[in-house]
Amino acid sequence: MWTLPLLIIVTTIVLSFPFGRYLAWIMDGRYKAPGWLRWIEERLDTGPQDWKQYVIALLLFNTMAFIIGFAILQAQALLPLNPDNRGTLSPTTVFNTVTSFMTNTNLQHYSGDQHLSHFSQIGFILWNMFTSAAVGFCVLAAIIRGLRSDSHMGNFYKDMWRVVVYAFIPVSLVMGVLLMADGQPMTFEGQAQVTTLEEGAMGTAPDGKPNPQMIVRGPVAAIMPIKHLGTNGGGFFGANSAHPYENPTAWSNFLTCLNILIFPLSLIVMFGVMLKNMRHAMVIYSVMTLMFLAMAVWSIYWDTLHPNPGLTAHGKQTYNVSDPTAPGGKRTIESPMVAGLPVDQELGNLEGKELRFGTSAGATFAAITTAVTCGSVNCMHDSLNPLAGITPMTGMWLNCVYGGKGVGMVNMLVYLIVGVFLAGLMVGRTPEYLGKKVEAREMKLAMLALLIHPIMILGPTGLFAALDWGRGATNNPGSHGFSEILYEFSSASANNGSGFEGLGDTYGYYDNQAPAPFSPHWDIATGLVMLISRYIPIITPIALAASLAAKKMTPFTAGTMRTDNVTFGFVLLGTVLLVGALLFLPAAVLGPVAEHLGPLPFGG
């Protein structure tokens, strides 16, 4: 039970140190690229950029990505590589999907194996998985240059080239081969028609003949490596990494977890190497690892070591819940639907789990995928025991426990600035970070970056929980329904992309005659949250780093607060927990905590 999480974290930690040094070597331009690659890189180099030029280049690149992505999805039915004749998604779903993949969120209000063609998967999804992940990486590199007082922030286009070509593509190729060898398909063929062993298992046609089974396939192995290396998370299949074609065996599950964690951990090492301050980086590394281990242990304890009370503890009970689409505005449900069955739960809560990965793999994966804002899932998060469901939410609320590709480290730097400021106030000294004074401008930028995240989660959650837009979309009553709404906006704001998936938020094709009634509301609301929560928290830290870069170094004295010792580690940990986590405590109490303590095992 504990072997898998320990093996994953130990292996990743060991690999992160040499790989982090390699990434620093790349981003500092100390490598010797082959001639033709160097020629392309030189063409992309438009010269050194200050922070405003860097941000403008970043926004222009993302604007072009949005336009191209929107065009591809709108024209999907007319484009090649569409053997299964996929149609055109609704306009709001296209907006949500393009925004989602452009911002590295990969929130999916559609099912990849049912709604997208191979061309869309390769030309839109795969492309954005590389570039959106690289954007966060580039932002971190630019901030590091500002913190070490370089004369410029670098060049965005040159940084993008370095990240994609020298970091992502080589590792993706190696991982792709390993995953294909383990059973992931790689083909541009359409669905395979097979005859089932049990005649009529797929139903019968009007003429009485048994229906064949249609198995979706495609270029899965091309997408899966960068899906996890880039902490993207969007699945080729609707079941995501629980699907046997995305995640065939326990070995592929281990590789997947390694892929998710390796870059976020290595970027902390890169931070220390580029700043020439490994002691400070190790304090950050240790704090993040401590928080991650706490999340993983909590998740496993409350899910794998505790049975699902909804299966055995209570008999069936009938409830009337609000549903604007039902006659009279109410619908009747039995909750829990399978209560009272003689189910053996010695292995813990097995609802929504794939046992081919091992008993603790679902809870472990849930902690990993939300700690680093990946969003890929190998179990149904909606089926986690209530207190175990707090783990993925906490990872998204903090958004810095390793965090996404570069952006997690950027978020931790914001907490660092706030922590230094609070510590300086407590001892009566002007706060300093890396020898630079932290003053009013830096604190305003830090607080803007910090507060936009809870605002974008709690505000829309309260709005949708109060309106039919939210209540009419949940498939569960009470606290669990509230948790579904809270999780969706937490995922959108954290650029995570996973979901409790009990929401009716899928419209489907534009000509769908029976879409989820409030799906356009969810498409637009989460799309706007993703945009705001992506760009404000990465632009303001760039401005903050540029502000610090313009200041003179102050000499180190006996009264200077050190940022490379255990004491500062506790200051940083306290800042993250007090400033970050406590903001969401009331929402957690209304959702998963109330569900755990309530009269019903689920959805009381």
Enumerate the language-model features and the residues they cover.
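Hydrophobic core segments of alpha-helical transmembrane domains in multi-pass membrane transport
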Residues: 7-18, 60-74, 138-144, 173-180, ...
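Alpha-helical transmembrane segments and their helix-start/interface "positive-inside/aromatic belt" motifs
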Residues: 3-6, 46-64, 155-173, 275-292, ...
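Hydrophobic alpha-helical transmembrane segments
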Residues: 56-66, 128-139, 256-268, 408-422, ...
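Alpha-helical transmembrane segments
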Residues: 152, 270-279, 425-439, 543-564
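P-loop potassium selectivity filter motif centered on the GYG triad
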Residues: 80-125, 185-258, 313-407, 471-529, ...
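C-terminal catalytic subdomain
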Residues: 414, 418, 423, 427, ...
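N-terminal alpha-helical transmembrane segments of multi-pass membrane transport
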Residues: 1-97, 102, 117, 121, ...
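Juxtamembrane/interface segments at transmembrane-helix termini
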Residues: 19-30, 71-84, 147-150, 178-192, ...
